[in-house]
Swiss-Prot record:
<keyword id="KW-0739">Sodium transport</keyword>
<keyword id="KW-0812">Transmembrane</keyword>
<keyword id="KW-0472">Membrane</keyword>
<dbReference type="GO" id="GO:0006814">
    <property type="term" value="P:sodium ion transport"/>
</dbReference>
<feature type="transmembrane region" description="Helical">
    <location>
        <begin position="183"/>
        <end position="203"/>
    </location>
</feature>
<keyword id="KW-0769">Symport</keyword>
<comment type="function">
    <text>Transports acetate.</text>
</comment>
<dbReference type="GO" id="GO:0006847">
    <property type="term" value="P:plasma membrane acetate transport"/>
</dbReference>
<dbReference type="GO" id="GO:0015293">
    <property type="term" value="F:symporter activity"/>
</dbReference>
<feature type="transmembrane region" description="Helical">
    <location>
        <begin position="77"/>
        <end position="97"/>
    </location>
</feature>
<protein>
    <recommendedName>
        <fullName>Cation/acetate symporter ActP</fullName>
    </recommendedName>
</protein>
<feature type="transmembrane region" description="Helical">
    <location>
        <begin position="33"/>
        <end position="53"/>
    </location>
</feature>
<feature type="transmembrane region" description="Helical">
    <location>
        <begin position="404"/>
        <end position="424"/>
    </location>
</feature>
<dbReference type="InterPro" id="IPR018212">
    <property type="entry name" value="Na/solute_symporter_CS"/>
</dbReference>
<feature type="transmembrane region" description="Helical">
    <location>
        <begin position="355"/>
        <end position="375"/>
    </location>
</feature>
<feature type="transmembrane region" description="Helical">
    <location>
        <begin position="206"/>
        <end position="226"/>
    </location>
</feature>
<feature type="transmembrane region" description="Helical">
    <location>
        <begin position="148"/>
        <end position="168"/>
    </location>
</feature>
Length: 549
């Protein structure tokens, strides 16, 4: 039965702009037993790690941050594993397969946010926070209002991202493994809950590390075999690809992805600032011992991800040569079997045979598990630490907080499974785009200004943050993706697909205006507290390290 894999595009941040290139009609494939066996090996191994981790999770610190004893190198790998989705691998390589050079430009968009995290956020975040970014945002501001806003921003981002991942996971597994969609969604949800429920951050970290290593190895092998085919010459790679691609030399020309400068700028800002506001990424900086290790984490993560996206570019051009020009991988109509999303999977078969094809399919499944585990833990910590322990029941014991966190994991898991089933045939490609827009318009401005602007007050942060969040949601609804494609209206009220340029501007302007006009005694006190916060953020003085942090 024919299915539309728009959900796969949704598992890639802001992939909606490339939906035409990386989505299309696909068929459920025959059961891939080699892939299933390899995936079962991965599951058994990671469940063993979860059991090992569960014996070492004795406190709140262990559960949320793995005791703060993850090294910078390990955390860099885990961050890369948390950030690189299955669709980063399949989607971007498919985009290169169809559009050529534009795929490289698009993939680089995922890296532009990391220098901001490295130079502006990582060190200060680690010096000021303990478990969530709300610890930093509320350091000198009113705990209640700021934590509620931060938790809401986190939960909305996590929920949207999680639904998109679950639907994408079901479609992807149905495509690669031949398993039933509902079985796939339940399987992902159950494994996700087991990793987080029993192993906490320690198990999640090692699942992400293993996934990153497997993905980097698989992509490296594919790129190596492609380059070997062309004599390790990029000139030969591009020449052969241009010779067989229907667009010819045009695949080396940029500019086909974004329709106008406003959309390009808005997309870029959303990718850049959204990355710096993702709660499951920011939470990883509390797993290392100090600010130095936090900086090293970003350095290693950026290196791993940069290397990975270069590999997807080579893989995409390799697919043009070895898959696009091979009738074995096409149906009777001349289209790629399974759709363009299968370009990298077919290439795995072309360069490594059925065994390597099974390995790549299993790795694609593993990437989904690593991402949803990180999302679930971030959502649970927002509820248990930010809302329960610091707003609704101040002074709650560690045991009570951990109990709430684990209950939240179960609730999030069940909700994710239910919504994954309900949204099976819905267009959810907008969800991750909206998640990034909210992260960029609500979370990022508050984090940045709370650390760098001495005049920020609770009033400004609250009003500006909520304005940014609401603006992002409203403009996304009124834009072409939801208003026209989903709701069926003839013309969009808001003409641009990406609201980030406007919603980020509203957030920063609102925070500045309402802080600058705040003449209350509370506002004056909050401004006076900035100096002490600044000294701690720069020096780390007073920060607890390692297992005690």
């Amino acid at each position: 039965m024919k299915r539309v894999l728009t959900a796969l595009a949704a598992t890639l941040p802001f992939a909606a702009n490339a939906a035409d290139a990386i989505s299309g009609a696909v068929e459920r494939q025959p059961t891939n037993w080699q892939a299933i066996i390899m995936f079962l090996i991965f599951v058994v191994f990671t469940l063993g790690i979860t059991y090992w981790a569960s014996k070492r999770v004795r406190s709140r610190n262990d559960y949320y941050t793995a005791g703060g004893n993850i090294t910078g190198f390990q955390n860099g790998l885990a961050i890369a594993g948390d950030y690189m989705s299955a669709a980063s691998f399949l989607g971007i390589s498919a985009l290169v397969f169809t559009s050529g050079y534009d795929g490289l430009i698009y993939s680089l968009g995922f890296l532009v946010g990391w220098p901001i995290i490295l130079f502006l956020i990582a060190e200060r975040l680690r010096n000021l926070g303990r478990y969530t970014f709300a610890d930093v945002a509320s350091y000198r501001l009113k705990q209640g209002p700021i934590r509620i806003l931060s938790a809401c921003g986190s939960l909305v981002v996590v929920a949207l991202y999680l639904i998109a991942q679950m639907v994408g996971a079901g479609k992807l597994i149905e495509l690669l493994f031949g398993l039933n969609y509902h079985i796939a969604v339940v399987l992902v949800g159950v494994l996700m809950m087991m990793y987080v429920l029993f192993g906490g951050m320690l198990a999640t970290t090692w699942v992400q590390i293993i996934k990153a290593v497997l993905l980097l190895f698989g992509a490296s092998f594919m790129a190596f075999m492609v380059m070997k085919h062309v004599g390790f010459s990029f000139n030969n790679l591009f020449s052969e690809a241009m010779a067989v691609h229907p667009k010819g030399v045009d695949i080396m020309k940029p500019g086909g992805l974004v329709k106008d400068p406003i959309s390009a700028l808005s997309l870029g800002l959303g990718l850049m600032f959204g990355t710096a506001g993702l709660p499951h990424i920011l939470m990883r900086f509390f797993t290392v011992s100090d600010a130095r290790e936090a900086r090293k984490s970003v350095f290693y993560a950026t290196g791993f991800m940069g290397y990975f996206y270069i590999l997807t570019f080579i893989i995409g051009f390799g697919a043009i040569m070895l898959v696009g020009a091979n009738p074995e991988y096409k149906d009777a109509a001349g289209h790629l079997i399974g759709g363009n999303n299968m370009a990298a999977v077919h290439l795995a078969n072309a360069v490594g045979g059925n065994l390597f094809l099974g390995f790549i399919s299993a790795v694609a499944f593993a990437t989904i598990l690593a991402v949803v585990a990180g999302l679930t833990l971030a959502g649970a910590s927002a509820v248990s630490h930010d809302l329960y322990a610091n707003v609704f029941k101040k002074g709650a014991t560690e045991r009570e907080e951990l109990r709430v966190s684990k209950i939240t994991v179960l609730i999030l898991g069940v909700i994710a499974i239910i919504l994954g089933v309900l949204f099976e045939n819905q267009n959810i490609a907008f969800m991750v785009g909206l998640a990034f827009a909210i992260a960029a318009s609500c979370n990022f401005p508050i984090i940045l200004l709370s650390m760098y602007w001495s005049k920020l007050t609770t009033r400004g942060a609250m009003l500006g943050g909520w304005l940014g969040l609401i603006t992002a949601v409203v403009l996304m609804i009124l834009g072409p993706t939801i208003w026209v494609q989903i709701l069926g209206h003839e013309k969009a009220i808001f003409p641009y697909e990406y609201p980030a340029l406007f919603s980020i501007s509203v957030a920063f302007l609102g925070i500045w205006l309402f802080s600058a006009t705040d003449n209350s005694a509370e506002g004056a006190r909050e401004r006076e507290l900035f100096r002490a916060q600044f000294i701690r953020s720069q020096t780390g003085f007073g920060v607890e390290q390692g297992r005690a942090h």
